[in-house]
Swiss-Prot record:
SUPFAM superfamilies: PLP-dependent transferases. This is Serine hydroxymethyltransferase. Its cofactor is pyridoxal 5'-phosphate. It comes from the Bacteria. It catalyses: (6R)-5,10-methylene-5,6,7,8-tetrahydrofolate + glycine + H2O = (6S)-5,6,7,8-tetrahydrofolate + L-serine.
């Protein structure tokens, strides 16, 4: 950076401090990742200056011939990655992508079947504090109390009983593979639309390491960050028959001008996904999550469902006598960033919780391998089991520092 340090030292210093935080801490928030320098360059380009309401070839502003090229590249690459018939890359977020699907096919008060937030769902899947739960009549399904896997028979029974217009699959804190074929069969049985929110697993789907929902779902939404390792944003994939309605729901329905600099960054990240080494990255994300899970098990720490099939691990802290709120703070103090998270049938309040959620997408981008994740699990065990012992916590800090120094981040940024 050449101009920002001179123009606005306050903002520059905050950015520099965040750069330092990312370098010196271990990032285990499952919804975060580290984009490449190329993605950051695209997002910081002159495209931030351009208004482009509408879609390629049908804009409400002149001078869009070059941003049209960029948006077409993003759409075509997404189609190639996921085998989708129609793609909209304009949603500013995953939440807005979900909203657009709802606005396309639902009326106020329609019944929708979605996953309980405390069982691993998402706010936009019917939480009463979210527009989705206010606007529509959401019925919740969840996981089996014993296995902590999605209870597909419960999904079917509720679908038959409530006859939803839409069934939503996908989660923000579910560590197991989702059977989209079963969901499709249930949706067909009751005549419902089927939508999948694959925000957390999109990168794993892209690499062929998780079943692809596109052949089964009428609509698939996702964020473009998380395991997909792009800029923060959203995307919708759907059958061609719904394409025009989806596009209208985004613009002019719920958004104005698209963020063309972000769409450029999406295009670049999609290009990276199409490269051969992305599959290796995604394989490492999963193997690292399994290494972390095994290490935590060795520490005697209980995991929801006993382990993981994807990029995240959900920790049940009750046997340690800790809440998620306390554990998040303890780990942050030693240099590990995580988030408190509800577990299925959680007795604690949402701002307290009985669990923490850990993910390996970001540390894998940084170069952490299985041995490093085994060490991370051991450090977490040390800190949580001795959270009131300052000597043990200092040992944990030193071990975190050794790992972050071994795997540097953004070495060429220059600030």
């Amino acid at each position: 950076m050449k101009h920002l340090p001179v123009q606005d030292k306050q903002v520059f210093n905050a950015i520099k401090d965040e750069r330092k935080r990312q370098q010196t801490k271990i990032e285990l928030i499952a919804s975060e990742n580290f984009v490449t320098e190329a993605v950051m360059e695209a997002q910081g380009s002159v495209l931030t200056n351009k208004y482009a309401e509408g879609y390629p070839g049908k804009r409400y502003y002149g001078g869009c011939e070059h941003v049209d090229v960029v948006e077409d590249i993003a759409r075509d690459r997404a189609k190639e990655i996921f085998g989708a018939e129609h793609v909209n890359v304009q949603p500013h977020s995953g939440a807005q992508a979900n909203m657009a699907v709802y606005f396309t096919i639902l009326e106020h008060g329609d019944t929708v079947l979605g996953m309980n937030l405390s069982h691993g769902g998402h706010l936009t899947h019917g939480s009463p504090v979210n527009f989705s739960g206010v606007q529509y009549n959401f019925v919740e399904y969840g996981v089996d109390k014993d296995t902590q896997y999605i209870d597909y028979e419960d999904v079917r029974e509720k679908a038959l009983a409530h006859k939803p217009k839409l069934i939503v699959a996908g989660a923000s804190a579910y560590p197991r593979t989702i059977d989209f074929k079963k969901f499709r069969e249930i949706a067909d049985e009751v005549g419902a639309y089927f939508m999948v929110d694959m925000a957390h697993i999109a990168g794993l789907v892209a690499a062929g390491l998780h079943p692809n929902p596109v052949p089964y779902a009428d609509f698939v939404t996702t964020t473009t960050h998380k395991t997909l390792r792009g800029p923060r944003g959203g995307m919708i994939l759907c059958r061609e028959e719904f394409g025009k309605k989806i596009d209208k729901s985004i613009f002019p329905g719920i958004q104005g001008g698209p963020l063309m600099h972000v769409i450029a960054a999406k295009a670049v990240s999609f290009g990276e996904v199409l490269e051969d080494d992305f599959k290796t990255y995604a394989q490492n994300v999963i193997s690292n999550a399994k290494s972390l899970a095994e290490s935590l098990n060795k520490e005697g720490i209980q995991l929801v469902s006993g382990g993981t099939d994807n990029h995240l691990v959900l920790v049940d802290l009750r046997s340690l006598g800790l809440t998620g709120k306390v554990a998040e703070h303890v780990l942050d103090e030693i240099g590990i960033t995580s988030n408190k998270n509800a577990i299925p049938y959680d007795p604690e309040k949402p701002f307290v919780t009985s669990g923490i959620r850990l993910g390996t997408a970001a540390v894998t981008s940084r170069g952490f391998d299985g041995d490093a994740l085994e060490e991370v699990g051991a450090i977490i065990g040390l800190a949580l089991k001795h959270h009131e012992d300052e000597a043990k916590l200092e040992e944990a800090r030193q071990r975190v520092s050794a790992l972050t120094e071994k795997f540097p981040l953004y070495k060429e940024l220059g600030y």
